[in-house]
Amino acid sequence: MMMLRQTSRKAYLGLQASPLGLGRRLYHENVIDHFENPRNVGSFNRNDPNVGTGLVGAPACGDLMSLQIKVDDSGQIIDTRFKTFGCGSAIASSSVASEWIKGKTLDEVMTIKNAEIAKHLRLPPVKLHCSMLAEDAIKSAVRDYKEKQAKTNAAAAEETVKA
């Protein structure tokens, strides 16, 4: 379940009152769109051998991100899910990452950099760590998937030798 530290709609939209009483937007519309309408929220069964899970966090701000990939036999990511506890920028970064990796191969997603996510969302420098979490979560999910596959293949090879 996604949760936010900010409690008001005004706070998470990044609206700040000016002396004239007019709102000033601090977040780009891409952040607001992915925050208000996050894509691919949820989770897969961690025990599924075709699912890789990346769980990363930022101790400094308390953001926590779980990103999961479902991979087919050819090594293509066919589906993805995420759950993020953190600010709107962290949720938006997770949502963008989950969209970008779907349909790509494991090798292709390993080339996605946080700077690309940050540029797309137009994150301010103080929020760059959110896009770094997304990049780290992608890499962690791929690593987890590959480790599962190596164990599965080793177990299958051992069974073949026994037979």
Curated annotation (Swiss-Prot):
Q: Where is the transit peptide?
A: 1-48
What molecular function does GO assign, one term?
2 iron, 2 sulfur cluster binding
Q: Which UniProt keywords apply?
A: 2Fe-2S, Iron, Iron-sulfur, Metal-binding, Mitochondrion, Transit peptide
Could you tell me in which tissues this protein is expressed? Mostly expressed in leaves, pollen and flowers.
Is DNA-binding found in the keyword set?
Answer: no
GO process terms (BP):
iron-sulfur cluster assembly
Where does this protein reside within or beyond the cell?
Mitochondrion matrix
Task: Give the cofactors, semicolon-separated.
Answer: [2Fe-2S] cluster
Please state the pathway this protein functions in, per its UniProt record. Cofactor biosynthesis; iron-sulfur cluster biosynthesis
* Family affiliation: Belongs to the NifU family.
- The protein depicted here goes by the name Iron-sulfur cluster assembly protein 2
Provide the species name: Arabidopsis thaliana
The encoding gene: ISU2
